[in-house]
Structures are given as structure tokens and as C-alpha cells.
Regions:
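C-terminal beta-signal and adjacent terminal beta-strands/loops
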Residues: 619, 777-784, 803-865
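Extracytoplasmic beta-strand/coil segments of soluble accessory domains associated
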Residues: 179, 196-243
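Short, acidic, small-residue-rich periplasmic hinge/interaction motif at the N-terminus
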Residues: 27-43, 130-188, 196, 231, ...
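Gram-negative outer-membrane beta-barrel transporters
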Residues: 486-489, 558, 562, 666-684, ...
């Protein structure tokens, strides 16, 4: 998969003396004599080049361009500055600048001595006949030219031409107005003090920490509280992250194993319109494309004394020749947080990815990742027990000698957990011939989580009368393996370019899952022969997911494109009990299958204007245990027999119309409306070991997004800005809920807004300044179904950062929550009973929350090489 990118050196000027001037060249590349006293000046010669990424929108429209550039080459042959002198627009200028600043040259020489020179270049982009996103009918690839040194017609042009590979894994083509892609360069301008914050580069996605420590993030998008991943599919290089039938919750997606600096790109879709996305993709998908090389190596140290925050990350991109690309990294992290009871959260991450070019048509990549962490966590606090939180003062009997808790306190300081993850991955890519491409991925991973949550008070928290409290231990240990194979064919029918993709995905999870009642992390198995005869659950789960898909893309006219697809999925799951004394005796097999059609139409009246219409059917799976739960123990009223709403695959349908305009280079504005119907939701609640069958739901709303990206004449000059607003309306649509007025969707976001601006500005040859400001806002939302729902309080948070770099050294600071807002980051409706509150009557439901970060100063120092 290659393209032809000629690089033309049009002229050069030797710097450093008043007499220096452009020198005409001979056919051998030597300066032509201009007189008897002419100096012997040798022009710079290109030594190594870097590959330019073809701008995806330009490649889609088969645009070609030539970008005029002027670069300064120092005495060592390095490019120390570059600017565009002949702009082409459509993203070509930025791509050419990014590539040319990585070039190296044999330096120009005067009388044999290396000297600094200015070189004028022409970087040409030619749309390849076989580009990743090209629908044009295939044609014979041009023969690759060798390195050329030629005399121009005016005896003053040195032309250097090379063949350059197309970066495999270029950004996907945009098939919906809501699709987005964020490059590594833009990611480098954004604050990255936590891994889950990478999700927030996706327009409309909010990610919060709702218990502290290393527990997975809680995410929101388009009217969905997707908790840890129930309705958004997450991938790392095509490896699915959402955990099926997880001990803590369905779709559990912990991103703490990702080192932010190793992410090369973040791609995202909304809705169910992509045929290659299956389980959990009802609201959309987010894919982290990991880097196999980085522009620079870096060692970065972060400190936030008020949080007890320390983070050290080292990323190295070693050079093993032109056929290898490699990146390795390690991260050491420790944090106590603002809490009275320190989180003591420590983790260690390691990462390595390498790509080997096998020949002109194929390459293979390998990746390994490792993560280990342990922590304490604050958990959630009943608002009525917290000073100044607006839900009233606790009853005098609530606490002895204290009327209320600090928002930084904990109802159970023994909460916490530990987690490990190890993953190995390989991917093979080959251009089989001029029509067919193959991509095959194989992966295997092991993950383990031991979590001790207590969503309330350690003593008599649950409303069911249990005397031993509500802390539980959730253990999930799994081996997961799978493959993803895709075959793509490009051709034409009746003169219409077509692209056909067929694929198969297999995933098998072998899981050991346990759930125990605990107190202070001590298991209570058997302490009460009637109510707690043993573990709540102790069993083995084997779950196999099989997916096949086909997608056809056809372009009957330059301004019209259709994408239609179909996907078939099947789930086969077994659960077996491992403890005769377990509260839940779960044994059995369940299987289910679904066929999901997809359809998209894209109309482009102008090159700068696209109209989209999308339809798709999809699903999210439910915990296999919820198909069988039936507790014989009367003292656990939360347990119930399987409900008719219990389905292994909850079907969904999605619709979207939208438009995208690009009025000027670098600026993209989008507007879209969406509707999502979900047939039913049935997920296991890992905190209470009960099932929660829910009827059908519907969400609809609108989304507005804007993004601007600018690269100046100096490639170190960079500016980005983005804005996103989403309004969503979601309700249960079951007739019984409508009649009872209990149609509100708990925790579902109603309105969200985010905006940010950041940039990098060189102020001299050696100095560069950069900074950013972001604002994120979530409106009030409902805490329960109603009919008079509790309200979860909204919030608005502003963060800012600034930094300065001198040559290879950088210093910077970020201020998180500039206004020091006392905000509730994670919120839930919980029925709880505080210590010393009467056992009867059962307290009314209330909001429990995890406090968000206070104003925090975070500093960093970095060294680049």
C-alpha cells in the first residue's frame, strides 16, 4: 500500500556570509562555476525523509497538490525551521510541514566546510490508485523511481524523488457527521493528567471518576449513562476492551492500562452505523490507535503536592533502520487525592509496539502492554450526611458528636482494590494484489480485578435489613483471546467505484467470578448460616462471541456515496456454580443471535459541504448471570427470578441526519440530530448482586460540534480549538412506566457542553510557548425514574495550562478547577441507612456522590531527545 510522493529541491541559499547566494548546479549536483573566483559550494543532499500523511478528506475526494516549502538546514544536516511558501490548503500544508521537519540532509558545504543553508522544496501529493480510502477503479501502480539528481531546465534545479509508503492505519473515512478523529499532534497539546481523559477529546463524551482510586471511569454520551461501558464499545488497536459478564458490571472498561503519550490517534463513531462494530456499540465506539513511533523521545515528571500526585513517564522511539518502527514506554504513578483517608493509589505501566516492513506490499506489527495497580477509594457519600450539600442536616442520631461529614471524608475507609492486565497483540497487513487487501489481528490478554466497593455506610447500609453492612468483594479473573480478520476489495461496476469489505471477529472469555459480602475487606462467608451461608456467587463463566460482517461502499457520482452493510452476531455462554453454599446457584447455557443491517447516504453538493443520513441496528449484551439469578434466601429481597425482560442481546436501532461544512482550511462545523431505540436493558448490579430488568427506552436529541486546527509557516506554530454541545431527551417507553409516570432515565445526561482552545507558539529559534484552556459543563439530571425524581446537581469546570520549552527542556503548569467549584463528579440515587439511624422505617432514597477535584496546581518538567 504505497503512494508516489516526489520531493523536489528547487533551490538553495548558503547562509553565513554576505556573498552567499543561490548556486546553480550541474547534472552531478555540484555548483556550476560562475567566475574564476567562485567558491566551491556543494548543495545539500537529502539523506532521510519522513512520510507525509495524506489528508483524509483530500484523499477521499482524490485531490492532489504541490506544497512549496522553505526549510533551514543547519551544519549537521538537521531541519531547524520550516515554513510554507506555496500553500495548497485542504490539509496538505500541515501534512507536508509535519513530514519535512523530520528530514535530514547532507549539509551544504563551502570549500569542504559544512554550512547552514536555506532550501526550497516542492512536496507533491499524488492520489494513489490503491489508497486505503480510495474508491477509484484500480490501475497499474507506477514504477517506483530511484533517488534522482537531475539538472533542471534553468540549470538551477536539483530534483530529488523518492517513493514513500502510505501510513497503514490512516484516519477512517467520515461516514457520519458525528464521526471524529484526533491526531497525535493535537493530543500532545491537550492536558493528559489521567488516561480516561483521552475519551474527552471525543465531542460530546464526558468521563468522570465516581469512586476514586483505580476503579474504571464512568462515561456519558448522547443521553446515555454508559457507566463503565454498557453502551459504548472501546478498542485498543482493534482489541475490544469492554468486559462481558464482569463481576463489577457489564461492559467494564478500565483504561488505566493506557499510557496517554503512546496513543497515536483517537477515532470515534456515534450510533450503530459501522458494520465492524458489534457488542456494546449502541451509543457509539471509540478506538485508541497506538503509536509505533513518536516524533520525539520524552521523559516527563508531574507533581501536584496538594494531591500527593507523582507521575513519571518515559517514551523512547529507537531507530532500527528504515524497515522498523518502534515505540517503548513506561509509567510510574502515585496519588493520594484530596481525601482525608489517602487513596494510596500506585500503578506501573509498560508498553512496547514495533512494526516491521516485510516488503513493498506487507508489514506486521507486534504490541505488548502490562499494568498493575492498587488503591484505596473514598467511595460515595450520602448527600444528607455531608456538610453544606443542600439535602438537609442529618438526623441527630446519625453521628455521635458530629452533625455532618466533610466532603473529603469516607463512609468506609476500607474500600479499595487492585487490578492487573497483561496483553499481547499482533497484526498482519498485506496488499494481496491490485484489488485485494488483507488485515488480520490476533490477541490474547489476562486481566484481574479485586474490588471492595461500599456505596454507602459500612454498617447497615442496605434497605433490606441486613445487619452486616453493604461492603462487597468483587473478584474477576479472566483470560480473553480473539481475532479480527478483514478482507477489502476495490473495483468498479458500470463505471462506479466500489469498495467491498468482509470480516470475521471471534472473542472468547474464560472467567472466574466471585462476589462476597465483606466488612473491612474480611469475607463474611458462613458467618450467618441463614442469611450469609457462603459467597453471594462463586462460579465459572465461558462466553464466546462470533461476529461476521459485510459492507459495500459505492460512489455513483463525485457528489454521492452510499455505504450499506449487514452484521451477524452470535453469543454462546455457559455459567457453572463452584460453591455449594453460594447464595446464587447459577448453572446453565444461553445462546442468542442477531442480524443487524446498516445504511448510510452521503451527499456532497460542494467539496466543502457534506450531508449525511444514517440508519443502523445493533445491540449490547447482558450479563449471562442475569439469565439465571434466583435466590432461595428470603432475607435477600433484592434477589428475584429471571424476568421476561431478561435477554442476552438487547437490540437497538439508531437514526441520524447531519451536515458538515468546511468554510475555511482547518475549520469543520457539524450539526446532527439522532434517535436511539433500545428494546430492553437487563444488567447485573455488581454492588448489590441483584438484577435490574428495564423496559424499552428511547433517546433523541441534537448535537453541534466545531473544530479548528492550524499549523503555521513554522511547524512549531500550532493552534486548535473545539466546541461541542449536546441536548438529549430520554425516557422509558414501556406502557406500565408511562401509566405510573416512572419514565425518567436515571443518571442520563440531558445537556452537556465543552469547549477548549490550545496552541504552541515559537518566540525565538530556541524558545516555544504553549497553553490551553478548557471548559466542561453538565446540566442537572434525574437521579431515579420518578414520578417525582430526585435531581443530580449539574456542574461547570474550567481548567487551564501553560508551558515553555527551551531546546530540549520543558516546564509547565496546569490548574485544574480554576474556580475551585465544589462539584459532585459522580452521582447516584441510593437507599441507605446511616449508622445509628433506626432500622425501620427504611429511609427514603437519596443522592450519594463522589466529590470532584478541588482547585489543584499540577506542575511538570520534561526532557526531549
Amino acid at each position: 500500500m504505497r503512494r508516489l510522493v516526489p520531493i523536489s529541491i528547487a533551490a538553495f541559499v548558503v547562509l553565513g556570509s554576505p556573498a552567499a547566494s543561490a548556486q546553480p548546479t550541474t547534472t552531478e549536483g555540484q555548483p556550476a562555476p560562475s567566475g574564476p573566483q567562485a567558491e566551491a559550494v556543494t548543495p545539500p543532499v537529502l539523506r532521510t525523509r519522513a512520510e507525509a500523511t495524506y489528508p483524509p478528506d483530500a484523499l477521499r475526494d482524490r485531490l492532489e497538490a504541490t506544497v512549496g516549502l522553505e526549510v533551514i538546514v543547519d551544519e549537521t544536516g538537521a531541519v531547524v525551521d520550516a515554513r510554507v511558501v506555496g500553500p495548497a490548503g485542504h490539509g496538505f500544508d500541515e501534512a507536508a510541514l509535519e513530514a519535512v521537519r523530520k528530514f535530514t540532509f547532507e549539509p551544504a558545504r563551502r570549500n569542504g566546510t559544512p554550512v547552514r543553508s536555506t532550501v526550497q522544496l516542492a512536496y507533491e501529493f499524488h492520489a494513489p490508485p490503491r489508497a486505503t480510502m480510495d474508491l477509484a477503479p484500480p490501475s497499474a501502480a507506477p514504477a517506483p523511481p530511484s533517488l534522482l539528481v537531475q539538472q533542471g531546465p534553468d540549470q538551477s534545479t536539483l530534483v530529488v524523488a523518492e517513493r514513500s509508503t502510505v501510513p497503514i492505519g490512516a484516519p477512517p473515512e467520515r461516514n457520519a457527521a458525528s464521526d471524529s478523529s484526533t491526531s497525535q499532534d493535537e493530543l500532545s497539546l491537550r492536558p493528559r493528567y489521567r488516561a480516561e481523559g483521552l475519551l474527552e477529546v471525543v465531542p460530546g463524551v464526558f468521563s468522570v471518576q465516581h469512586a476514586g482510586g483505580g476503579k474504571a471511569q464512568q462515561d456519558f454520551v448522547r443521553g446515555f449513562n454508559i457507566d463503565h461501558g454498557t453502551d459504548m464499545a472501546f478498542f485498543v488497536d482493534d482489541v475490544p476492551i469492554n468486559a462481558v459478564s464482569h463481576a463489577h458490571g457489564q461492559g467494564f472498561s478500565d483504561l488505566h492500562f493506557v499510557i496517554p503519550e503512546t496513543v497515536g490517534r483517537v477515532d470515534s463513531t456515534k450510533g450503530m452505523y459501522a458494520a465492524h462494530v458489534g457488542d456494546f456499540g449502541t451509543a457509539g465506539s471509540t478506538s485508541f490507535v497506538m503509536a509505533d513511533h513518536t516524533p520525539e523521545s520524552i521523559a516527563r515528571l508531574e507533581l501536584a503536592p496538594s494531591m500527593g500526585h507523582e507521575r513519571l513517564v518515559v517514551v523512547e522511539s529507537p531507530d532500527f533502520g528504515s524497515k522498523w518502527r518502534m515505540a517503548v514506554a513506561t509509567e510510574v504513578f502515585y496519588e493520594n487525592g484530596p481525601f482525608i483517608h489517602p487513596e494510596n493509589y500506585g500503578r506501573l505501566n509498560a508498553y512496547a509496539k514495533a512494526t516491521r516492513v516485510l516488503d513493498e506490499r506487507s508489514e506486521i506489527s507486534f504490541m505488548a502492554m502490562a499494568y498493575g495497580g492498587s488503591w484505596n477509594m473514598s467511595g460515595v457519600l450520602p448527600a444528607r450526611a455531608v456538610c453544606g450539600e443542600g439535602d438537609g442536616t442529618p438526623r441527630p442520631s446519625a453521628y455521635s458528636g458530629s452533625n455532618c461529614l466533610s466532603r473529603w471524608d469516607s463512609v468506609d475507609p476500607t474500600q479499595g482494590g487492585a487490578s492487573q492486565r497483561f496483553m499481547a497483540w499482533t497484526e498482519y497487513r498485506r496488499q494481496l494484489d491490485e484489488h485485494w487487501d488483507l488485515k488480520a489481528t490476533l490477541y490474547s490478554l489476562y486481566s484481574n480485578l479485586q474490588l471492595f466497593p461500599n456505596d454507602g455506610i459500612a454498617a447497615s447500609f442496605q434497605p433490606d435489613g441486613m445487619q452486616y453492612g453493604s461492603q462487597v468483594e468483587q473478584d474477576d479473573s479472566r483470560n480473553e483471546s480473539g481475532t479480527d480478520v478483514r478482507l477489502t476489495h476495490r473495483g468498479a461496476l458500470g463505471g462506479m467505484p466500489m469498495r467491498t469489505t468482509i470480516g470475521m471477529q471471534l472473542r472468547n472469555d474464560v472467567i472466574e467470578s466471585q462476589l462476597h459480602r465483606t466488612e473491612g475487606r474480611v469475607r463474611l462467608d458462613g458467618i450467618d448460616p441463614v442469611n450469609i451461608p457462603g459467597p453471594i456467587f462463586d462460579g465459572h463463566i465461558n462466553e464466546l462471541e462470533t461476529g461476521v460482517f459485510a459492507e459495500e461502499e459505492v460512489k455513483p457520482a463525485r457528489w454521492l456515496r452510499f455505504v450499506v452493510g449487514v452484521r451477524g452476531d452470535r453469543i454462546d455462554a455457559n455459567v457453572s456454580n463452584e460453591s455449594p453454599t453460594a447464595v446464587y446457584q447459577l448453572d446453565g447455557y444461553k445462546g442468542a443471535a442477531q442480524l443487524s443491517p446498516k445504511a448510510t447516504a452521503i451527499v456532497s453538493p460542494l467539496d466543502e459541504w457534506d450531508l449525511f443520513a444514517n440508519y443502523g441496528r445493533g445491540f449490547h449484551s447482558n450479563d449471562i448471570r442475569s439469565m439465571f439469578i434466583n435466590s432461595p434466601i428470603a432475607a435477600l429481597p433484592s434477589a428475584q427470578a429471571p424476568s421476561s425482560a431478561g435477554v442476552l442481546m438487547a437490540a437497538a436501532s439508531g437514526y441520524e441526519v447531519g451536515t458538515t461544512v468546511r468554510p475555511v482550511d482547518g475549520l469543520s462545523l457539524s450539526a446532527m440530530a439522532f434517535l436511539i431505540d433500545l428494546t430492553s436493558e437487563l444488567v447485573i448490579d455488581g454492588d448489590t448482586a441483584s438484577t435490574a430488568p428495564a423496559g424499552p427506552t428511547q433517546r433523541y436529541g441534537a448535537e453541534l460540534t466545531g473544530r479548528y486546527s492550524f499549523v503555521g509557516r513554522n511547524p512549531r506554530q500550532r493552534l486548535y480549538a473545539d466546541v461541542s454541545f449536546t441536548a438529549a431527551h430520554g425516557r422509558f417507553t414501556d406502557a406500565a412506566d408511562v401509566a405510573a409516570g416512572t419514565t425518567y432515565l436515571p443518571d442520563a445526561p440531558i445537556r452537556t457542553f465543552s469547549a477548549g482552545i490550545g496552541g504552541r507558539q515559537p518566540v525565538s529559534r530556541d524558545w516555544t510557548l504553549q497553553g490551553d484552556v478548557t471548559v466542561r459543563s453538565m446540566s442537572d439530571r434525574y437521579g431515579d425514574q420518578g414520578p417525582t425524581p430526585l435531581i443530580e446537581t449539574g456542574w461547570t469546570i474550567v481548567n487551564a495550562g501553560i508551558g515553555a520549552r527551551w531546546k530540549f527542556l520543558e516546564l509547565g503548569a496546569d490548574v485544574i478547577n480554576i474556580a475551585d467549584v465544589a462539584w459532585r463528579e459522580g452521582q447516584f440515587e441510593v437507599q441507605s441507612r446511616l449508622p445509628k439511624e433506626p432500622v425501620s422505617p427504611v429511609p427514603q432514597p437519596g443522592i450519594s456522590f463522589t466529590p470532584g477535584m478541588p482547585r489543584t496546581l499540577m506542575t511538570h518538567a520534561a526532557v526531549y531527545w
